[in-house]
Structure formats: C-alpha cells, structure tokens
C-alpha cells in the first residue's frame, strides 16, 4: 500500500544531542504538551487490541493495525518519552506512566467503539485528524529543532494513518450502505469526545508526578489544559483540519461550500475548546 513501501523513520534518526535544552527547559506548557502526548501514544497497544477484536475476520485491516499502526504509535510514544528524559530528566516518567496506564485501561473497552465497522472507521478518521492537528501545531509552536523535527514526523505518520482508515471506511460504507446523516452524527459525537478521558487522564498523572501538591487542584489542571489548548489553537491550520473532518461525508463541492462555515464554527468552538 502507498506509504508503506518506503522505510519508516527510526528513533535513531533523531539526534537528541542537538536539543536546545536552554530553549525549552523552562517551558512548562511545552513540557505538559510533550509528556501527556507521550503517555497516550505509549498506551496505544491497549486500543489496538480492541480494534483488532472489533475487525476480526478482516485480515487486511487487522494486519495493518497490528503490523503498522500499533508499531508506529508505540514508536511515537518512545520517541516522545526520550525527548522528555533528555530535557526534563528529573521527571519520573515510568512511575507516572504506570499510574496513567492503570486508569487509562479502564477507558479502553470494545463496547465503547461505534456500532458498525464503517462508523468506527469514521471515528478513526476523526481521531487521526485530531492527532495530526495536535502534532502539526506542536511543531509550529516551537523553534527547538529536534522537537520540531519529531512533531513533524509524527504528524506525517498520523496523516498517513488517516488515509488508511479513510480507505477502509469507504469499503465498509459501501457494504453497509451508510447514509451521510449517520456519518455526520459519528463525526460530531467523536469530535466532542476528542478531549475526553484520555487527555484528561494523561494531564492529571503528569501533574501528579511533576507537581504532587497540585494533583488535587482541579482549577490548576483546568488552567494547564486551557493553555495547552490555546497553543494548539494558535498554531493549527484550520483549513486542513476542516478538510480532513469533512472528507468522510463525501459531499458534492457545491454542498460542501454551503456547510463549510457552520462546520468550521463547530470545529473552533468544540474541537478546539
């Protein structure tokens, strides 16, 4: 398949000795952006198993999930963890991650997936849109060369994952004869859930290890989350995000032009809240 013929990048391709530590060491907002992302990516194997179970019998999908998607997501986690350890070595990543994983595992349940395979592929497209947007914005938000390189590599991977999920979606949509109203419902619902349990869980456990005295301070954690969201919102590319969100609807160009503005408003007020 396209995108898999060329060799995927390796963590060894990143020269962590080039990190401009003095440039990012005191940037707490950046620390939380990178550390929380490293937790979520590192827990990808939990979610992969649920998806493999859900799509069991479709060897093309399950093979790609296990051999490509999961491996690349876990690599993202390892690379982000390595970056955290180089810049903030005092942060007890392993201890904090164990706490995160124990809670995160309770959110990864097959019964929480969409009711049909086509709709779950729709949801996957939304999630990949969110992650690609996150890492693109992270890359734009910093001038530190190693993080910029890493975030750009991850964003490129997420776009490639989106393309695979979208292709699988089209196959299942044809089989299920899915109408646009159901697709739109899944896009809206999954977009609303993008900043739900996993992101909140990651931030809480990073705070618990980084600033234990603030671990129970809901207002402080909310402020952190708001600053992180502001960074993403300031540095994203709305047009690209909007195009990715709308693509599963497969609307005629004329209709797409008409509904683009309200969907963009929805994206800005909910997806980026």
Predicted regions, residues:
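Non-heme di-metal
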Residues: 1-273
């Amino acid at each position: 398949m396209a995108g898999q013929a060329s060799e995927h990048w390796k963590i060894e391709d990143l020269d962590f000795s080039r990190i401009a530590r003095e440039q990012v060491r005191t940037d707490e907002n950046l620390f939380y952006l990178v550390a929380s992302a490293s937790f979520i990516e590192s827990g990808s194997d939990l979610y992969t198993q649920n998806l493999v179970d859900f799509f069991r019998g479709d060897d093309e999908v399950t093979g790609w999930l296990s051999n490509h998607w999961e491996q690349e997501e876990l690599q993202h986690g390892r690379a982000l963890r390595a970056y955290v350890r180089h810049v903030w070595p005092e942060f007890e990543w392993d201890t904090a991650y164990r706490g995160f994983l124990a809670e995160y595992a309770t959110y990864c349940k097959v019964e929480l997936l969409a009711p049909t395979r086509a709709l779950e592929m729709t949801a996957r497209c939304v999630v990949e849109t969110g992650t690609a947007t996150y890492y693109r914005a992270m890359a734009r938000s910093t001038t530190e060369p190693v993080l910029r390189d890493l975030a750009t590599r991850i964003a490129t991977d997420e776009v490639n994952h989106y393309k695979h999920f979208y292709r699988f979606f089209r196959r299942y949509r044809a089989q299920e004869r899915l109408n646009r109203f159901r697709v739109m419902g899944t896009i809206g619902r999954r977009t609303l859930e993008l900043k739900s349990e996993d992101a909140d869980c990651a931030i809480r456990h990073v705070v618990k290890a980084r600033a234990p005295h603030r671990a129970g301070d809901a207002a402080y954690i909310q402020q952190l989350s708001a600053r992180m969201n502001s960074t993403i919102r300031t540095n994203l590319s709305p047009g690209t995000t909007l195009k990715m969100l709308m693509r599963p609807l497969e609307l005629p160009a004329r209709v797409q032009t008409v509904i683009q503005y309200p969907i963009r408003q929805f994206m800005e007020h909910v997806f980026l809240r």
